[in-house]
Amino acid sequence: APSALTVQAEEADAAQTAEVSGVEYQIYPTPHEMTYQDGGFDIGEVNIVYENGVDDVTKNRMTEVLSIKGKSESAAVTNAKVDGKTNILAGIYGSDGYVDKYVKEHYTVDKSLFDHHGSYFLASNKGEIVILGLDTDAVFYGITSLKHIFNQMDGTTIRNFEMRDYADVNIRGFIEGYYGLPWSNEDRMSLMRFGGDYKMTSYIFAPKDDEYHKGKWRDLYPEEELAKIKEMVKVGNDSKCRFVWTAHPFMGGFNQAQADQEIQALLRKFDQLYDAGVRQFGVLGDDVGSLPRTIVINMMTKVSEWAKKKGDVDRKSVV
């Protein structure tokens, strides 16, 4: 026969489950699909399974989320589910890895979900949480949704649910390109961290108080200024609201008679910033004026070729 303590524990679990059944979580941007199931469970000692394609930044996000409920330090990382623990599985769709196979075997997820930008499946179900993303960034977005939920949970009890979500546009973020009071670097980094909490992808750096973006776009940054760029790049990488460096060459006296040399100067500048860790670049063309379009086309062709040779530059240029 069960002991009095066992009965009390079961009654407490039942009360928690009943209480959480009416909970609905507020997540922004609003997920495309969120369905709730009856009941929930208490998050106990955590076991995490990561597939190989999940990057360190995404793992760090998981640690951050677990720390909200004091679960990060005791969490273990293994290669498979562990009985008696709260298992959190994070993997990539189509990888044929442990999590990819597990989700296909235990959940119903239409493959068309993964035709969309940043798509992921997130489920909380009877002692386990699973995140299956289109890529490691999408897994990060799923864990970020979990962060929203953890911040709203009363205690460590989470409701059973399934979420299917994706982005309607590929580039999501903000640009600093106005002529008013400039932001400080602390402002910029704070905004990237904020953007990372809302699944933004990009902070487009185009401040008009930075002469090396505008009037001195040909000139390399001094080391002191480059160090500041490196710091912002790191925050962008860590938040996945990535730092996008742009040049404004057509406002800065572009010499069309020496267009080839001007383009080479721009690529040298890009090389310097690439070495500083920047992997997203843009060219602002809003002041192109009467410049022959063939020059602009040639510039962007050369920029695209440069990015392709680098191999790891995001080739979505901003024009």
What are these regions (language model features)?
Residues 10-126, 154-164:
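Acidic, contiguous N-terminal accessory segments
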Residues 318:
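Conserved small/polar residues in nucleotide/adenosyl-binding loops
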Residues 1-8:
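C-terminal segment of classical bacterial N-terminal signal peptides
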Residues 108-109, 113-285, 308:
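Feature activates predominantly on carbohydrate-active enzymes
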Residues 258, 285-311:
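Active-site cleft segment of glycoside hydrolase catalytic domains centered on the general acid/base Glu
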Residues 59-62, 225-229, 262-267, 294-303:
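Well-ordered, non-membrane alpha-helical segments in soluble/globular domains
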Residues 63-77, 154, 198-200, 240, ...:
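Structural alpha-beta junctions
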Residues 94-95, 250-251, 288-289:
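Short, internal active-site loops enriched in acidic
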